[in-house]
């Protein structure tokens, strides 16, 4: 039987960033091959650093998918744990070591007997940086294994052990990276009339773009436009030629995200025209679409967990953070949910360390749900 705690600790020590999860993939394949030995209804494929494990059903009517992410973050770990990261500057600070371990535990249970329906376990790379789910889908990695329904979870530090939280609509917002560069004309600070100050134009843009959310977004829906980087100039007495802004757009629906993206671009171009200068606007959403749960499937999952002993189900509001499972859920109906890990430190914090008792709870809960879906 798989030692969940040791497996998690092994994985925790080898975090790797997206599409570089070579040790992680090797470790996972070793475990998967041991678990699936002698199971003639199992097939395994790899895609770059990702893994797909397909359990052929005995009388399949559909394919049920379970997705886990496998990448770490470029963070220096500060937990002080004896099994801390052995990779300098890399850490499993978002709980993907837990996600992988739970998926392996569920795979082990699913292999106890051939399921009626097909089951697909997806070990997806590059959730954090390259939207690996989108890359796999667009590259045809699923082939005829593409699920009819897709499920997944994410650990959440501010929920207690035994709590599961989701809803029947949006769980994560869609995110879009924004880069804007204004280009004017540099010059001496004493002669502003001979220059065209990009810093002034960029500053004007930052104030004007605030109207996008306040005047273009339905207040019931909500959206966020934040610029966290503003770079302009190198010294006090020189008017800068260029100004660079780097920010993010977040919205509950893809339609709203596209509207906000359009308005941000329009405001930037309008400001540039008003100041008679050039502007470059780069909008990069990629696969980070809103994670929109299928209402009927979410209701089914919520009812299932609500009746499970030891589980407290919470109907939760959307999170303004992003998650690339949204892309796959834009192609396949499915549900994502939160699993409580009761940590005082937030996701992506260098001291984030979940409670390991969650592993057994997660495996028991998820495997029982997948068993139900596989038998329908």
UniProtKB/Swiss-Prot annotation:
Q: Which reaction does it catalyse?
A: N-acetyl-(2S,6S)-2,6-diaminopimelate + H2O = (2S,6S)-2,6-diaminopimelate + acetate
Which keywords describe this protein according to UniProt?
Amino-acid biosynthesis, Diaminopimelate biosynthesis, Hydrolase, Lysine biosynthesis
- Organism of origin is Streptococcus pneumoniae (strain P1031)
Indicate what this protein is called per its UniProt record. N-acetyldiaminopimelate deacetylase
Its Enzyme Commission number? Answer: 3.5.1.47
**Functional note:** Catalyzes the conversion of N-acetyl-diaminopimelate to diaminopimelate and acetate.
Tell me, which GO biological process terms does this entry list?
Answer: diaminopimelate biosynthetic process; lysine biosynthetic process via diaminopimelate
What Gene Ontology molecular-function terms does this entry list?
N-acetyldiaminopimelate deacetylase activity
Active-site residues annotated for this sequence? 69, 128
Pathway recorded for this protein: Amino-acid biosynthesis; L-lysine biosynthesis via DAP pathway; LL-2,6-diaminopimelate from (S)-tetrahydrodipicolinate (acetylase route): step 3/3
């Amino acid at each position: 039987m798989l030692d969940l705690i040791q497996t998690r600790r092994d994985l925790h020590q080898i975090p790797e960033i997206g599409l570089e999860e070579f040790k992680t993939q090797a470790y996972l394949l070793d475990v998967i091959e041991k678990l699936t030995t002698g199971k003639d209804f199992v097939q395994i494929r790899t895609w770059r650093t990702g893994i797909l494990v397909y359990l052929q059903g005995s009388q399949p009517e559909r394919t049920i998918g379970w997705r886990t992410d496998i990448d770490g973050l470029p963070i220096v770990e500060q937990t002080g744990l004896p099994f801390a990261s052995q990779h300098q500057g890399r850490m499993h600070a978002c709980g993907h070591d837990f996600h992988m371990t739970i998926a392996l535990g569920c795979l082990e249970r699913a292999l106890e007997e051939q399921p009626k329906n097909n089951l697909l376990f997806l070990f997806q790379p590059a959730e954090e940086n390259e939207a690996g789910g989108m890359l796999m889908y667009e590259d045809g990695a699923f082939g005829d294994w593409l699920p009819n329904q897709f499920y997944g979870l994410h650990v959440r530090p501010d929920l207690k052990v035994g709590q599961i939280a989701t809803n029947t609509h949006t769980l994560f917002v869609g995110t879009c990276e924004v880069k804007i560069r204004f280009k004017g004309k540099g010059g001496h600070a004493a002669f502003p009339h001979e220059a065209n100050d990009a810093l002034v134009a960029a500053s004007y843009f930052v104030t004007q773009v605030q109207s996008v959310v306040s005047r273009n977004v339905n207040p019931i829906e909500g959206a966020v436009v934040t610029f966290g980087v503003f770079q302009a100039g190198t010294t006090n007495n020189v008017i800068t030629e260029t100004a660079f802004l780097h920010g993010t757009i977040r919205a509950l629906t893809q339609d709203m995200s596209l509207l906000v993206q359009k308005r941000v671009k329009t405001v930037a171009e309008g400001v540039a025209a008003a100041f008679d200068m050039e502007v470059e606007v780069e909008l990069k959403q990629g696969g980070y679409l809103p994670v929109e749960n299928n209402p009927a499937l979410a209701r089914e999952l919520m009812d299932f967990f609500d009746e499970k002993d030891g589980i407290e189900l919470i109907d939760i509001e959307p999170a303004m953070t992003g998650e690339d499972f949204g892309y796959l859920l834009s192609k396949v109906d499915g549900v994502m949910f939160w699993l409580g890990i009761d940590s005082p430190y937030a996701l992506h914090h260098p001291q984030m360390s979940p409670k390991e008792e969650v592993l057994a709870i997660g495996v028991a809960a998820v495997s029982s749900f997948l068993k139900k879906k596989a038998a329908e």
